[in-house]
Amino acid sequence: MSDYDHARIKKLVLKGEKLKKSKKRKKEKDEAGSSKKAKVVVDEDAVKHGGWWAAKTAADITGTVSIEFGDRSYLKAMDNGLFTLGAPHNAGDGPDPEEIFTAFPINDRKVAFKSGYGKYLKIEKDGMVTGRSEAVGGMEQWEPVFEEQRMALLSETGHFMSIDPQDDACVALRKKVGQHEICKVRSNASRDVVIDTEPKEEKGDLGEVEKNYVKKFQKFQDKKMRINQNDVKELEQAKAQGSLHETLLDRRSKMKADRYCK
């Protein structure tokens, strides 16, 4: 194991806390067959990033993470305690080792990031972001801010982390979010995936749902779609009562728009 990797896996140290010798943990035995494997829904965005998925909430930002600016370019730690933007990666590739951090939740809003060199990201008085802190204080804490499917990292001084377009250095100089402040924190942790079991015909509003089922079952000899012109409130009521499919079938049969209805 390299010095970089060895440093990256150490625990969070708060300022004023004494260092304790780590104790070896016994490996937990895998309970094979104790739980069924969950069905996986493919996250196309994660596939393009080597399996690293984008955090949607602050709770997602924990453990092994990367910080992406732009498309497949990640914040990279350097051995002088500074950060730069790494070179763009090919589709399907994940971040390099120097582009991988460990995130430690401070509370339900803020996190601290430790580089692979074992130092915490800190906002300096001049706006530079450095990685030279041995422990976490206020200046080492960052708040992920989410708005309209975009994210930015807010420092203790009220400035957002960004990449300087002049030299690709990591800074936090602006109190408003622009294109250079928008980023994504990505994780490669395993996660529970919500399986989409809704039939494709039932996506959209009830008017679209009815059209979808007509397309699926209608006899198209004359190439004309026959839609029941009665108010869709009938469908809303049927959905609330759990009889949507029966009502849709009845409406199609009245229009002779179902090849299975006589």
Swiss-Prot record:
Report motif location: Nuclear localization signal: 23-39
Report if keyword Nucleus is assigned: yes
Which is one GO molecular function term here? actin filament binding
Which CDD domains does this entry report, sorted A to Z? beta-trefoil_FSCN_FRG1 (cd23338)
Q: Which InterPro entries match?
A: Actin-crosslinking, FRG1
Motif Bipartite nuclear localization signal: where in chain:
239-255
Q: Which PANTHER family match?
A: FRG1 PROTEIN (PTHR12928), FSHD REGION GENE 1 (PTHR12928:SF0)
Q: What is this protein called?
A: Protein FRG1 homolog
Q: Which gene encodes it?
A: FRG1
